[in-house]
Amino acid sequence: PMTLIFARDNSVAAIREALFARRSVAYSDNTLAGRKEYVEPLLRASVTAEKTGRTRKGKIEVALKNVSDIPYRFADPATNRLMVAAPLTTTYVWMDDAEMKHTWLVRNIYIRPDKHLEIQPLSLQR
């Protein structure tokens, strides 16, 4: 287990202030837990989504590139589809136009004990 603390500097006072202000994210067993304003930027710094083409059947090819060591697990509740952006790799997934607008759950990021981070795939584009 590890705690990421978002302090203004590395002084004891700044770290204490950040902890009391709850500017931290817990990390354990490839799972992040913290406030949305802290975990979402970590995901966005780690994973990008890019449309790379279309198949003959009209599906959109999307490259999920993960530059971190955390395997992010995405779920699309509308289709019961699971996707994993493996560490330090690019994962390709194929979706139709409607699926691109769905909201995904990030199964290994918690913003509350009972709630996963939600994100739209195209919002990960840079």
Model regions and ranges:
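Charged catalytic cores and adjacent phosphate/nucleic-acid-binding surfaces used
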Residues: 1-126
